[in-house]
């Protein structure tokens, strides 16, 4: 059993093992005020947006301001076997950036610069801490944009988007984060830095380690710089359709039919009856009086008007009560309804947000499975979906137990839901990642051999296992 000792670090008294205190002394000497052991700074690091909380303060926080800071931190942590949790803005929904006792949090939030924008090559070189929406605001005068758009884009970092391979409302047309990254600089657990990828559009030299790191949730290394692919801002009118259906199965069938017709809306979002009722209560509106399910479809680009007309024809033909608008303000107001979904649920209790994805043609079957699970367990599961790519977000609203734990009945229902998604040819996670919350189901999807291989790959990058232990 390790002996607990006292020490003073940056004028704050701390307790820890001999190696922990040695690490803190070394970090303080190397990084100065970039190191904090102040409980007020550490308290927010025990949670993210998933609703999970470790309820134990981490050892310390390093706020890195440069690649050198990251390298120094990891060298010291590696030498003294201190576990490190990389963290951006803490907006993750799977517990991937949550820290607990004895762990060192390495934040890249202060590394938030755009280092280069090349209009000719349609790329930008950025630091990981830049906020997604801020990046696009700064790119707009160049007529370019970074396409990945998670719902948290106003508060999430691009580094976090890369670490989780984030998706978003527009990814059915424009792709997920992996498709928008050309290259990375990644610091390994021992402090060495890898320069991965390239600036060219094409490149097939060696194994694609860039793609491997994207979505690895901080388990292979710490992303300290990214070369990202940009797109010209879409031109032409933006059309928005709001379509109400009598039930979620009909709306899901309409979204699948739009895809089957060869149409590629920029965004296609589906909100079920429970979602609409929660939003009604939160916003003081009466959406659910129009229909029990809302399907939002938005088209952009040169073919926007033709695509919108074709989508509208499909929707009306399948019984949708639909309106089409080219008014940008009205379109934004309609999608603000979708963005109000999670705040509406958070106003009702603690929320466990799930993230299954199925083939688009299986959306009606997955919604039917969720309805069956609701009835089986007697619990509501309000669900929204990125219908354009088959990614559903079933939500469980609950009252935590005395120690903050999720009630077992919620996990039982989630277990049935994951198995239903896998049976339909889907996945546990379309865009949020595995983190802490979905680890217990990882083997169900990957199988023993693939899971073992992934663990071996992780050990090659991080032989001591100090990076984000206990995660994906």
Language model: regions and residue ranges:
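Noncatalytic alpha-helical scaffold of FAD-dependent oxidoreductases
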Residues: 1-472
């Amino acid at each position: 059993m390790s002996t607990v000792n006292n020490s003073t670090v940056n004028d704050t008294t701390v307790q820890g093992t001999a190696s922990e205190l040695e690490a803190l002394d070394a970090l303080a000497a190397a990084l100065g005020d970039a190191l904090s052991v102040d409980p007020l700074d550490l308290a927010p690091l025990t949670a993210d947006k998933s609703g999970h909380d470790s309820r134990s303060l981490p050892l310390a926080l390093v706020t890195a301001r440069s690649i050198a800071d990251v390298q120094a931190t990891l060298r010291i942590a590696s030498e003294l076997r201190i576990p490190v949790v990389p963290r951006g803005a803490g907006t993750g929904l799977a517990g991937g950036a949550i820290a607990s006792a004895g762990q060192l949090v390495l934040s890249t939030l202060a590394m938030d610069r755009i280092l280069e924008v090349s209009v000719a090559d349609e790329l930008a070189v950025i630091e990981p801490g830049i906020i997604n929406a801020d990046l696009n605001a700064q790119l707009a005068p160049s007529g370019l944009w970074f396409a990945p758009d998670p719902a948290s884009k106003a508060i999430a970092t691009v580094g976090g988007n890369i670490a989780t391979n984030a998706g978003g409302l527009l990814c059915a047309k424009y792709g997920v984060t992996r498709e928008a990254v050309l290259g990375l600089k990644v610091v390994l657990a021992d402090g060495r830095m890898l320069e991965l990828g390239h600036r060219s559009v094409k490149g097939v030299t060696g194994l694609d380690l860039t793609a491997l790191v994207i979505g690895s949730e901080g388990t292979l290394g710490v992303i300290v710089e990214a070369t990202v692919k940009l797109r010209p801002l879409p031109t032409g009118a933006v059309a928005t359709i709001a379509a109400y259906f009598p039930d979620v199965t009909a709306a899901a069938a309409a979204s699948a039919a739009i895809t089957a017709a060869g149409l590629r809306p920029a965004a296609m979002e589906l909100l079920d009856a429970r979602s609409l009722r929660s939003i009604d209560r939160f916003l003081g509106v009466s959406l659910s009086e129009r229909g029990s399910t809302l399907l939002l479809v938005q088209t952009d680009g040169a073919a926007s008007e033709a695509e919108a007309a074709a989508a509208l024809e499909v929707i009306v033909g399948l019984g949708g009560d639909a309106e089409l608008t080219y008014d940008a303000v009205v379109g934004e107001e309609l999608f603000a309804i979708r963005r109000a979904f999670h705040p509406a649920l958070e106003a009702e209790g603690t929320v466990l947000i799930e993230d299954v994805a199925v083939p688009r043609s299986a959306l009606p079957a997955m919604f039917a499975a969720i309805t069956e699970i609701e009835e089986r367990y007697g619990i509501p599961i309000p669900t929204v979906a990125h219908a354009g790519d088959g990614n559903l977000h079933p939500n469980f609203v609950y009252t935590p137990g005395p120690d903050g734990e999720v009630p077992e009945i919620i996990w039982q229902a989630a277990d049935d839901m994951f198995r239903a998604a896998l049976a339909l040819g889907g996945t546990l996670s379309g865009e949020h990642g595995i983190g802490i919350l979905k680890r217990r189901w990882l083997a169900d999807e990957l199988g023993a051999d693939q899971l073992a291989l992934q663990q071996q790959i992780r050990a090659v990058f991080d032989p001591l296992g100090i990076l984000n232990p206990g995660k994906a």
